[in-house]
Amino acid sequence: MDLVLDAMEIRVLGSLIEKELATPEYYPLTLNALTNACNQKSNRDPVVAYDEASVASAAARLVEKGLVWESGVSRVPKYEERFTHERSLVPRESAVLCVLLLRGPQTVGEIRGRTARLHDFANLEEVQAALDNLVEWGYAQQLARMPGHKESRYRDLLRGEVEAPKGPADLKLPDIPPIEIARIEKVEAAVERMQKEIEDLKTAFETFKKQFD
């Protein structure tokens, strides 16, 4: 496809799609919340440590490309993604694309396991159907099966087309155990709630101060 994003833009877009599906009550995201989402330790490959200025720059580029919208209604600007809405993707397709953006190439089984928080797929056939649609529309690509592997993997095409890896260099470290992921996600959700409460308090305080200006 003609649209090619860099690694930071991919992370920002993927994080926005994820939060819209997983925690809509805290969406759209402030710059602080978006930065934290990009830097999550769970459900990210690779794990990164972007600063707010870099995330703001990437978000601005996505706004220019029409993939993200920056809301200026509230005192604190907030970001929301437009990609899935402009292209009329349904939740199951958005969920699959999201994990491809955040985790890189994966098998159908891996995708189903990693989309559990985003969409309830009844079986692998539903995941495959969503993937087939994304491939047909030019948003995903099926990679050649690696030697010694039974299943093919899929990757997103928003970062451009690349040749499928041909050797063991593509091997990844084992995933974090599910019980540990659940614990981390609970902590991250609690942090998000506290950050939103702090932002609400700041807004209320600014409003209170204006009464005496």
Task: Please describe what each predicted stretch is.
Residues 74, 81-110, 152, 156-182, ...:
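Short, amphipathic alpha-helical interaction segments positioned at domain boundaries
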Residues 1-10, 22-25, 43, 48, ...:
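Eukaryotic, polar/proline-rich low-complexity intrinsically disordered regions
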Residues 83-130, 138-141, 145-147:
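Extended, charged alpha-helical interaction scaffolds
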